[in-house]
């Protein structure tokens, strides 16, 4: 459908249809249901299907498997698998559908435009660098950046777990995340299973977030069709069946931050007439890049971008992106909107954009996300011990 539309119609269709659905059922509305259930006033609307199953439950486990979106679950698990048998509801990831934006949105019950956690790497003007938010590393050079917590200091967040604890001291609310996200986190799926069981044992009231970075890691490396991916998704299915059986007093949700697709790469530097119009390095994501353009060159940039990449990418101006709330709704600040360049592009097929002249080292992943396909955006929530 997209290929036969001109660039203006592509953008209008995306805003009118895709983003309308995104802003109604997503990770943010899901986590606002968790807030509401534990007595905290929600920031946004809640997810009705989730509200229903939460009723009466004092112990809630929120288990996120990175990258295991709807397309991955339905590709690798049979209809009678434990996870699919317990399917509850389909929601959208954040835009862009990437871990730093999506997990932060879920953990704060706020949209990326509110938190400022919008992508994998963002340009911090104070430091003149693209910084990977989770790692405090220069995206282009790989160097560790000082001071130690630039993202946390510049765009600090407060999680739903903190809010729940503040509201009710009797509720145990915390996270368990795979090493090295947590220094003492589990390193394998087997350890992850043991940690879930150990954590839940003996608790009366709790809201606990469990995070594991598979199958995202494997799909980046091998693509979404690889046997290794199939094996690990089916292993996850068995683990969930066991922990739910072992903890019948706990309401479990399994879900993802985004899906995954197999990808191809295009080098932005191949078109010097276009690349030379940039004032700063490309930022955000390879499937949803943002561009800071030299003064007075915006019109030329748009024309050339659509000429070379209009078949594969939607292009929006910063003003259009903010007006159409592609990064979500809610209060924002100049600190946050300054991360957005003059233009934002987003992939509508398998292509990624990178700039070879800007990268000291570059990995050509076989699988990726953060673009604008249904496969990347849709997430199935499953619920157990309802």
Residues of each region from the PLM?
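Feature captures the catalytic ectodomains and active-site-proximal regions of enzymes
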Residues: 2-4, 8-386
């Amino acid at each position: 459908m997209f290929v036969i539309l001109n660039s203006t119609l592509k953008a209008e269709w995306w805003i009118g249809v895709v983003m309308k659905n995104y802003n109604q059922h997503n990770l943010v509305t899901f986590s606002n249901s968790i807030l509401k259930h534990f007595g905290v006033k929600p920031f946004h609307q809640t997810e009705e299907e989730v509200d229903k199953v939460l009723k009466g439950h004092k112990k809630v486990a929120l288990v996120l498997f990175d990258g295991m979106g709807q397309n991955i679950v339905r590709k690798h698990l049979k209809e009678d698998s434990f996870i699919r048998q317990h399917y509850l509801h389909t929601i959208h990831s954040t835009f862009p559908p990437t871990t730093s934006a999506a997990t932060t949105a879920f953990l704060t019950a706020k949209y990326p435009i509110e938190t400022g956690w919008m992508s994998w790497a963002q340009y911090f003007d104070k430091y003149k660098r693209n910084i990977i938010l989770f790692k405090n590393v220069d995206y282009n050079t790989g160097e560790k950046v000082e001071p130690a917590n630039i993202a946390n200091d510049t765009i600090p967040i407060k999680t739903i777990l903190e809010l729940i604890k503040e509201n009710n001291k009797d509720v145990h609310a915390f996270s368990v995340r795979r090493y090295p996200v947590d220094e003492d986190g589990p390193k394998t799926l087997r350890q992850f299973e043991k940690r879930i069981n150990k954590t839940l044992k003996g608790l009366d009231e709790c809201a606990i977030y469990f995070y594991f970075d598979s199958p995202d890691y494997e799909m980046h490396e091998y693509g979404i069709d690889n046997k290794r991916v199939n094996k690990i998704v089916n292993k996850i299915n068995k683990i969930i069946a066991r922990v739910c059986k072992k903890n019948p007093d706990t309401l479990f949700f399994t879900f993802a931050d985004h899906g995954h697709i197999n990808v191809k790469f295009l080098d932005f530097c191949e078109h010097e007439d276009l690349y030379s119009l940039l004032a700063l390095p490309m930022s955000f994501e390879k499937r949803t890049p943002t561009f800071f353009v030299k003064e007075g060159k915006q019109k030329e940039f748009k024309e050339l971008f659509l000429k070379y990449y209009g078949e594969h990418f939607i292009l929006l101006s910063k003003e259009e992106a903010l007006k159409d709330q592609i990064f979500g709704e809610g209060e924002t600040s100049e600190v946050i909107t300054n991360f957005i360049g003059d233009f934002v592009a987003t992939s509508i097929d398998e292509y990624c954009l990178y700039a070879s002249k800007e990268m000291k080292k570059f990995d050509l992943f076989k699988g990726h996300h953060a673009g604008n396909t249904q496969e990347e955006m849709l997430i199935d929530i499953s619920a157990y011990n309802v």
